[in-house]
Amino acid sequence: SVRDELTKADDGRQWRQLLVLDGNGETAAWTGDKNRTETTHLAERDLVLGGNMLAHANVPNVMRDRFHTLTQTSQRFELCLLDALVAGFEAGGDVRGTTSAMIKVVYPNALPLDLRVDDHPYPMTELQRLYDMTRDPEYRSFFDRLPTPDKPHQY
């Protein structure tokens, strides 16, 4: 498996956490036993979640439940991801506190959405603000005119 290939040659694998989701929805996960408690991962079709130093082992389950609830609605995929991150944060998240957050979504024939917040006192609020900016009509007008793999000459 891809998980085995990526971890077998890594002498530090016991300290690593690996979460993989491919373009077909297949998932793989690894949590080395030297990661700090509470550690866990959850891998199912189209979704993989994990963490270490979590407030409790249920954090990924809370995130999964929020994600599945929202994907049953007409919410945009990236908004489902953002709301799942917020749910994990609200469920206790990382015991050290949360200072960063990111979302990256790659579409086959469109530009990726790549939002990242580093070292911020309110990373979830800031990530939401960045996402909201991408939905602004003026921004969308610009973004929608950028070249994409299927429309490399648009402007």
Residue ranges and their predicted role:
Residues 1-155:
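N-terminal nucleophile
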